[in-house]
Design a protein with these regions (language model features):
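Active-site segments of SGNH/GDSL-like serine hydrolases
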Residues: 112, 154-177
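Single conserved hydrophobic/aromatic residue that forms the stacking wall/gate
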Residues: 175-186
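A solvent-exposed, charged loop/short amphipathic helix patch at secondary-structure junctions
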Residues: 118-142
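Basic, amphipathic N-terminal segments that precede the first structured/catalytic domain
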Residues: 4-7, 13-98
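Structural motif
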Residues: 5, 104-106, 164
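Short, solvent-exposed beta-strand-terminating loops
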Residues: 109-120
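Short beta-strand segments
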Residues: 10, 106-110, 168
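Short amphipathic alpha-helices and their capping/turn segments at secondary-structure boundaries
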Residues: 88-105, 151-159
Length: 186
């Protein structure tokens, strides 16, 4: 229904569907962290929304003339830390404020591969074209995904007991995958 409030999270598929819904006058919040592909990055983003986290300059890094967040898509990157933080924190505040009123949360997973920043042992939402040596690549198990999602779903239900959650899988292919088998497993 056009009156439903919808938040979409995930891959470029979620982004495209969300933009199509917006163009047709649905009430949507599309990818508050920008495009995210793996289930753990999306869980981390939801935890940050649930906890009303505010980003500081310590959460950013500078590379290639821009400030970036490991958890956000490059649409949030900016030439100054202040501008980057303003974009990130504004979207976080909007998502946190809107969560209790949502009717639908649509989650689209694009891959079961996650990347961990070695230096901080954290899952990242975006590698921002940084050297491979900074990251550990991991194929998530079903058990890991289920465990993380069970916890965040419990918290989401506390904030919004009537929230309907739709999980989808992105129809994308991993063209840059080292092997066709990786695409299949992912």
């Amino acid at each position: 229904r056009h009156s439903d409030r919808i938040m979409l999270f995930g891959s470029c598929f979620a982004e495209n569907i969300g933009n199509l819904l917006l163009a047709n006058k649905f009430r949507c919040d599309v990818n508050p962290f920008g495009i995210l592909y793996n289930p753990l990055s999306i869980v981390e983003a939801l935890w940050q929304i649930l906890s009303h986290q505010t980003y500081t300059e310590e959460d950013l890094f500078y590379a290639g003339g821009c400030w970036h967040s490991w958890m956000h898509h490059s649409v949030f990157s900016a030439s100054t830390a202040a501008s980057c933080l303003s974009s990130i924190n504004t979207r976080l505040e909007q998502a946190s404020a809107g969560l209790p009123q949502l009717d639908w949360l649509v989650i689209t997973w694009g891959t079961a591969f996650a990347y961990w920043l070695k230096e901080r042992t954290m899952v990242v939402g975006n590698c921002h074209k940084q050297p491979d040596s900074l990251f550990t690549r991991q194929l998530l198990t079903v058990e890991e995904i289920v465990t993380e999602w069970e916890c965040v779903l419990v918290e989401l239900r506390k904030v919004n007991p009537f929230l309907k959650i739709l999980f989808t899988v992105s129809p994308c292919l991993l063209y840059t995958s080292p092997s066709p088998r990786d695409t299949e497993r992912s």
